[in-house]
Amino acid sequence: MKKEIIIGTRSSPLALWQAEFTKAELSKRFPDMNITLKLVKTTGDVLLDSPLSKIGDMGLFTKDIEKHLLAGEIDLAVHSLKDVPTGTPEGLVITSFTEREDTRDVIISKSGKGLMDLPQNAKMATSSLRRMSQLLSLRPDLEIMDIRGNLNTRFKKFDEGDFDAMMLAYAGVYRLEFSDRITEILPHETMLPAVGQGALGIETRTDDAETREIVRVLNDDNTEMCCRAERALLRHLQGGCQIPIGSFGSYIDGTLKLLAFVGSVDGKTGLRNEVTKAVKTPEEAEAVGIELAEILLSMGAEKILADIRKTC
């Protein structure tokens, strides 16, 4: 067995938390292994002046790390799964899906008021078209304002800027110990999360069987079933830019329930549906994702997505 493992990661506080978590979990199982981190600056860490909706988010936070992985300079890469494009580069594979944190989104507000109690025309900070679409469907009066940067930077910008509220993923807020700032946790009925939200995806080379075997011990089977279904749905619908799609899967006693949303950026058009099926394998879970994607397309999702792609 390998005596040394090099983990590639971004240098943001949340990315470092994720990498250190992975290192600690591997060290518990392989105490004699020397595990080190290699920090990689990604395009997404550099391009902070433009909204994600303008520059797209396809691999902004993963491509540069993947180059190091393909070159053999690192043995594995740890990503927020929601940042990982559904089509991984040839030669790479998501080997492990870690146990998922709470997938919901949260509201941070300066007034302490929740989403529906914010004042008329409140200024809401988010860089996500998925959140924007669902927010505007509920509160068309909101003024959506872009906010970029790592979590610590966003909190600083929010506190110092002209914002009434901000929306973030619970998982990151919790992991970096900002939970005391949460005003409201939004249920899935209100806000479906990003595909893979709350889970880590550990990526390895397909030809590195030894590392894949090592990393596989961190896999959570329930998380894999849900995330494989969500990612299959996104892959079946996805264009080349950021689009307003949300999805959440739950897998209990052999039954997978998959929810999904596709909406227009202005929130005026939104489609939701779900599929519930008994599944036994990740491949069967992916088939559920494709089935739900086809249902959404038959409901009119293609027109919504085509209109959005015209602006990409």
Swiss-Prot record:
Species this protein is from: Chlorobaculum parvum (strain DSM 263 / NCIMB 8327)
UniProt keyword annotation of RNA-binding present: no
Annotated positions of the S-(dipyrrolylmethanemethyl)cysteine modification: C241
Cofactor(s) demanded: dipyrromethane
NCBIfam families: hemC
Top-level EC class: transferase
Record's protein name: Porphobilinogen deaminase
GO biological process, one term: chlorophyll biosynthetic process
Purpose: Tetrapolymerization of the monopyrrole PBG into the hydroxymethylbilane pre-uroporphyrinogen in several discrete steps.
Quaternary structure note: Monomer.
InterPro entries to which the protein is assigned, alphabetical: HemC (IPR000860), Porphobilin_deaminase_cofac_BS (IPR022419), Porphobilin_deaminase_N (IPR022417), Porphobilinogen_deaminase_C (IPR022418), Porphobilinogen_deaminase_C_sf (IPR036803)
Entry-linked PANTHER family: PORPHOBILINOGEN DEAMINASE
Record EC number: 2.5.1.61
Gene Ontology terms: cellular component: cytoplasm
Cofactor binding summary note: Binds 1 dipyrromethane group covalently.
